[in-house]
C-alpha cells in the first residue's frame, strides 16, 4: 500500500494489468499443483501484493472512465484544497463516493466467497485456482482488446529495491504476529517453541522496521501519519470494528455444530450480507449528503453490530431455525457498511495527500490482519473455555450406565480402532 501513489502515477494501466494478470496466473498454477505449505504461503504473499496493485489500477481507471474524474489529482501531494470551503467540499464528495466504492467491492468479495465455497464443495479446493486461471486468461484477453497503450514517460522507475526490503521486514512482522494469534491456542501458546520464536522474530523485525523508517530520508512508511488525530481515531475505530465483527464466527459455529450445516450452506447464508451492504450503502450515502454528523453514523453502525449480537444471544437454542439466521447476517452487514465506508472518510479529513498511502497501509493492516486475528483468538479461546465448562458440567454424572452415552462412546471407540488408532 505505501507504493500506491508511486505505482498509479505511472499511468501504464495496460502494461501493469498484463504483467499482474500473467504473474497471478503463474502463482495460481503453483498453488493448484504444490503440496508445500511454504510455497502456498509465499505465493499468497506475492498474490496479495499483485491484487492490491491491480485493484488500485483498475479502480482509478474505472473512476476516470465511469465518473469522468481524474482521480490522480485527488491524491497528488501539493494539490490539496487551500481553503476551508475546499476541504468541506472534498469531505462531502468522499462521504458520497466512498460508500459506493465500498459497496461495489464488498458485493464482489461476497460473490467471490460464495463461488469459491461452491467450487470447493462440488469439486476440490484446487478447482478454485483452476477457475481463477481461466478468469485471468479472460482478463488478459479483455485488456489486450480494450485498453490503450501508453508509453513510459520517465526513465527512472519510481520504486527502488531498498523499499522492497522494508516491505519484506514489515511482512515478516505481520506474518509472525498472525502465526502467534492463529496457532497459539492450538499449540498451547508459549509452551511451544515455535510460538516463542515467532514472538521474538516479530519483536526484532518490528523494531528494525521502526528504526529504518524513522531514520530514512524517504521512508517506505510515513510514521508522522500518527500525529494526526483523525488517523489515530480511525485506527481505533477500525480496531474495535474488526474485533467486534469477529463475533460473526458464532453464526457459523451455531449453524455448523447445532444445525449440522456444511461449509457451502454457511456460505449461502452469508449471501444475505449483500442485502445488508446494499441497505447500509444507500443509507450511508443519503445520510452523508444530508449532512448528518459522523458521531451519529458511527453510533448507528456500532448499534447495529450490537443488535446482531443480541439477536444471536436469544436465538441460540435447541429450536433455532436456519431461516432465522439470515437476520443477524443482514443486521451486522448493514452496520459494517456504515462503519467500513465512513471511517476512512473521517480519518482523512484535512489530511495532507502525502500521508494517503501510509493511511491505506495502516487501515488494511488493522482491518485485515491485526484486529481480525486478535478478535478470532479472543473469541475462539472464550468459546473453548465455555465448551469445556459445559461439557464438564453436563457430563460429570454420566457414566456407562447411561444408554445413549454408552452407545455413543462405544461407537466412537470402535470407529477409532477401525482407523488404526488406539
Sequence positions of predicted segments:
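Helix-loop-helix hairpins in multi-pass membrane proteins, especially solute transporters
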Residues: 9-164
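Hydrophobic residues within membrane-embedded alpha-helical segments of Major Facilitator Superfamily
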Residues: 20-24, 30, 46, 53, ...
